[in-house]
């Protein structure tokens, strides 16, 4: 196939009539785009039907779904349905992985010990981490000794460990768009990850879900059939 500047689903056999299952064509298009560093662009107001699947479609390049519509049909996926040992209701349609995997940064124990010796972190005064990273970094802070609770409503529970994610620049300065939400009496753990340098843009598209109608117990009825993002520096435009 002659190398093109963009890829569309019809190049790989998609019908786009809202009836034919276009899952395999969509997967093939993205795999080709990923391999060749090409954007995926939908042409016109096509409707793509997506049925059950056992693995997500990977996205590594820019996508413009434009006026296209995607029908994600869960109506035939029972809560406990499996294929090849995989629970079908838990398979995302699209997945945006981090190129080369997630790069974790080590060596922050000294800073953590210093912070704890000084009484922790105050959300009103914390502006900088005294570490020279050399590049922007995503930090995840934990206080395993403190729990935050949702006490009322359908999401009420037994609490979760206090944690949040912030971004600092190459010199350790806190990004004003990611201020601390909580005070930390103690930082028990800190994970640091390199931020993906190359930006990625996902835009356009209308998504419709046909749900599976069931009277099964509530804990069986959570479906994860959408788009999962596991990298940073991604812009979503509706």
Model-inferred region functions:
Residues 1-238:
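Extracellular/periplasmic carbohydrate-active domains that bind, remodel
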């Amino acid at each position: 196939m002659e190398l093109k500047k963009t890829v569309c689903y019809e190049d790989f056999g998609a019908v786009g009539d809202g009836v034919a299952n276009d899952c395999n064509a969509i997967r093939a298009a993205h795999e080709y785009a990923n391999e060749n560093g090409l954007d995926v662009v939908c042409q016109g107001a096509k409707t793509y039907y997506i049925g059950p699947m056992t693995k997500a479609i990977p996205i590594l390049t820019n996508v413009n779904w434009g006026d296209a519509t995607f029908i994600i049909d869960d109506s035939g996926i029972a809560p406990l349905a499996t294929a090849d040992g995989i629970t079908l209701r838990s398979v995302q349609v699209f997945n945006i992985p981090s190129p080369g995997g997630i790069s974790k940064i080590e060596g922050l124990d000294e800073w953590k010990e210093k912070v704890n010796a000084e009484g922790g972190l105050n959300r009103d005064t914390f502006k900088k981490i005294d570490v020279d990273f050399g590049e922007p970094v995503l930090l995840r802070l934990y206080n395993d000794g403190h729990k935050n609770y949702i006490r009322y409503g359908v999401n009420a529970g037994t609490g979760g460990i206090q944690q949040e994610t912030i971004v600092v620049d190459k010199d350790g300065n806190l990004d004003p768009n990611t201020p601390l939400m909580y005070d930390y009496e103690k930082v028990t753990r800190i994970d640091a990850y390199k931020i993906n340098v190359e930006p990625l843009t996902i835009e356009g598209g209308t998504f419709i879900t046909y749900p599976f109608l069931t009277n099964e117990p509530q804990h069986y009825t959570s479906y994860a059939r959408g788009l999962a993002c596991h990298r940073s520096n991604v812009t979503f435009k509706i």
